[in-house]
Amino acid sequence: MKINEVTDCIINSAMEVHSAVGPGLLEKAYNVCLAYELSVRNLHFERQVRLPVTYHGIRLDPGFRVDYIVENCVLVEIKAVEKVHPVHLAQLLSYLKLSGLPVGLLINFNVVHLREGIRRRVNNYRSEDESDPRRPPRPLR
């Protein structure tokens, strides 16, 4: 499945969740519902994936956790906030940089129309070798 197809499936899954339960719930509720929708669509995903930081050749664990990695190519961060702030987008970009994944989605469920709560970002930090679309992303663990 191509990256755009994966992101479309994730967005459609999120829209299904949002249309069923609406805005106003806690982030954890949306996480559980989205996991169900992704599994119904037979998408491979991991939840709460730890992201290490390599510092002077040493892998350190600062406690960063990504909400979802879907089909090993799309990073997904879930929010249920009144407004998406620059710090939320910076978090997404940092996670993309650390993971080496090509695309990230930030989905804020606390909006009337979900399309207004979706932000898609491309990882501009990938090395030339990693930017080859035929090369799988580096493993996270």
Locations of regions flagged by a protein language model:
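Interdomain/boundary linker segments immediately adjacent to catalytic/signaling cores
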Residues: M1-A20
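Intrinsic disorder/low-complexity segments
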Residues: M1-K2, N124-R141
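Conserved catalytic cores of phosphodiester-cleaving nucleases, focusing on short active-site segments
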Residues: G22, V66-V84, Y95
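Hot-dog-fold acyl-thioester-processing enzymes
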Residues: P23-Y30
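N-terminal, polar/charged subdomain of small-to-medium soluble alpha/beta proteins
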Residues: V32, G63, I69-V70, Y125
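A short acidic/basic microdomain associated with nuclease active sites
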Residues: S39-H56
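Nucleic-acid nuclease catalytic cores
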Residues: K79-E130
